[in-house]
Structures are given as structure tokens and as C-alpha cells.
């Protein structure tokens, strides 16, 4: 949906500040939607998995959280991918994703024996954080010119909404004795 607009901006050599404004505007909306889903899962996911899968699947909740939470960052920064494609600078991202896969596979192989499925999920979590959050955000900031500190300042101002939703869900569960 954003690709035509972003491509037009890239062709016109739009200044990075305008890309930043779009990145923040769309990212805030995506954060609201995704934080609602993640908050609902944090509040109700354990009970949902217990009802759906039954006994013996308690670790599935923690596995889901370890994978779901770091994936929220590239989801709320999806506009950046459109910007990379429009500027024809997506090769670096592809290389980072290859490194994420190698790191994930290596850590999973190393940790799954000792820590089981939680170790595998932790390996995925660490690989995502290093690649998708640290390295890709650095690339957006240093090489593309998107003001990532300003983006995170805007997102962090919205975090109380997510915390309130999670707290309300927790109180509902507590009141219902679930």
C-alpha cells in the first residue's frame, strides 16, 4: 500500500526527515494494532493455550512470547522495508537476515539439548533482537537517514496504552479466578 508513495518520494530525492515522518506515522498505527494483540496474548495466552492444547503444553506460552515480542519491532517498522526497496538498498537487510538465520540455527543447536524448546525459542529471540532490532535500526539510522531515536521516542510515549491494556486483562483474569 505504501510502496507507490515511498517510491515516488525516493525518486524525487525526498529529504530523510520526510521519510522519518512517514516511518513514525505508520509505525505508531502499527504499534497500536500489534500492541493490542500482544497485550491480549500476554494477558490471556496462558489460559488460551491451556484450554486449547491441554496439560503438558505450558511451555508453549513462553515460547510464543519469546518469539512474538521481538518480532513486533520489524512489524511496526515495516515502512522501512518499503523505503529500502524504493532506494534499492535492501541487499544489506538480506545479508542481515542470512546472519539471523545462521545465528538462530547455531544457538538453537547449542541450546536445545540443554534447555529444550525454551532454549530454541531463546535462540530465536536473541537472533531477532541482534539482527532485526539492533543492526537493522542502526542501518536505518546511519545509512538511510531515518531518525530512529525520534521513532522510538514516539513509540515509547505510546507504551502506557499497552501496559494499561495488559493490566486490565490481568485484573479481569484475577477477578474471574482464572
Q: Where are the model-predicted features located?
A:
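Helix-loop junctions and terminal segments of transmembrane helices
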Residues: 1-27, 81-86
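Transmembrane helical elements of multi-pass membrane transporters/channels
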Residues: 1-8, 29-32, 66, 70, ...
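Membrane-water interface at loop-to-transmembrane-helix junctions
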Residues: 19-34, 58-66, 84-96, 100, ...
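Hydrophobic alpha-helical transmembrane segments of multipass membrane transporters and ion channels
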Residues: 28-36, 69, 73, 160-168
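Short runs within selected transmembrane alpha-helices of multi-pass transporters and secretion channels
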Residues: 39, 62-112, 117-142
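Interfacial segments at transmembrane-helix termini and the short loops linking adjacent helices
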Residues: 41-72, 144, 177
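Juxtamembrane/transmembrane-helix interface segments of polytopic membrane transporters
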Residues: 45-49, 108, 112, 120, ...
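Transmembrane alpha-helical segments of multi-pass transport proteins
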Residues: 100, 153-178
